[in-house]
Amino acid sequence: METLAAINRWLAKQHVVTWCVHHEGELWCANAFYYYDPDRVAFYVLSEDKTRHAQMTGTRAKVAGTINGQPKNVALIRGVQFQGEIRRLEGEESDSMRRQYTRRFPVALALSAPVWEIRPDELKFTDNTLGFGKKLHWLRAE
């Protein structure tokens, strides 16, 4: 649990996620601001259905991605890699996460884009501030 707590603290300070989906032999990546729910260990993003990545995702797909800062000093590099699933939320679940998202990013109140949940099954946190190449791993217990 200490590993997840360390990862959660760092993720709460970031705001952009990159994720990639695969469909019929094609890969595509996207970036978005995210709301992170540490209790669910999930990211929430807004993205229009007409985007290439949303069309490739359908309502649910496997996903992989990263979240990272941009330090110039290698000793300060920190970042998360993940793999899991992305799905489009509907109904009350969507409404609830939209409220959380717009609390963090009020400008999103003007958007009607669907809410998507990225639910990692695995997180790998590289934190060079703990020592060069230090990795913390977390796996979702099913």
Swiss-Prot record:
* Top-level taxon: Bacteria
Q: Sorted alphabetically, which NCBIfam families does this protein's record hold?
A: PRK03467.1 (NF002900)
The record's similarity note reads: Belongs to the UPF0306 family.
Q: What is this protein called?
A: UPF0306 protein Ent638_3591
The record lists the organism as: Enterobacter sp. (strain 638)
